[in-house]
Amino acid sequence: CNFPETVKCLPENKAVLTGTPIRQELLSGDAREGLKFCGFNAAKPVILVIGGSLGSVAVNHAVRSILPELLKDFQVIHLCGKDKLDASLNGTEGYVQFEYIKDELPDLFAAADLIISRAGANAICEISALAKPNILIPLSANASRGDQILNARSFERQGYSKVLEEESVNAQTLQSAIREVYENRQTYINAMKKSGHTDSIGRILSLIQECERK
């Protein structure tokens, strides 16, 4: 299972918390290549914003509204979604925006010091496996079946993530969350590394081998 809440819903000794297997190429990213791809350097930490394939109007607006302040201390990679590019920001030092990234994504993950993301199960498990401090902004209950909210709250309870409800996302709340998570980043990193999510495939294989021996 992926969440401890799921284990509690199943018969005793019938479920094991393993985390979700992730794409192995994500674990082989090169931070230097990620910085080079974006035209960044190692002088400032990097925030990676992932708004999903369609992007999030609320998240995009909040990020861009605090960009001048963010760029004093951070560099920002913004995956803003299809048709969500802001041409007026092209050429802004320390900021790059893309509708979507595929092949270079492992390198961008490796370069990131903090990630802002939606809370789909696959996305958050990838973030956890990489032990990247993160802020999760789940789809609202009005725009989804509510699963992202449950995912995000579970990760928050386990100490892996900071959660902002989409309805509360604005310049002030986002900037405050970024400062809080970055200042306490090692606490989040330690919690994720202890979770075992960094080697979900290995844990699942071990369970299968154990069952074969019985």
What residue ranges belong to the model's regions?
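Active-site-proximal region of nucleotide-activated glycan assembly enzymes
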Residues: C1-R32
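C-terminal alpha-helical cap of glycosyltransferases
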Residues: H197-K214
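Short hydrophobic beta-strand element within catalytic cores of glycosyltransferases
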Residues: S117, P133-R145
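Acidic donor-binding loop of glycosyltransferase active sites
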Residues: F98, A110-C125, K132-P133
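A short, well-ordered alpha-helix in the C-terminal region of glycosyltransferases
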Residues: Q186-T198
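Short acidic/histidine- and often glycine-rich active-site loop of Leloir-type glycosyltransferases
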Residues: E126-A129, R145-Q158
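Donor-nucleotide binding loops and adjacent catalytic segments primarily
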Residues: A31-E33, F40-L114, I149-N151, R157, ...
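Short loop/helix-cap segments at secondary-structure boundaries that form the rim of catalytic
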Residues: E5-A15, L85-G94, I127
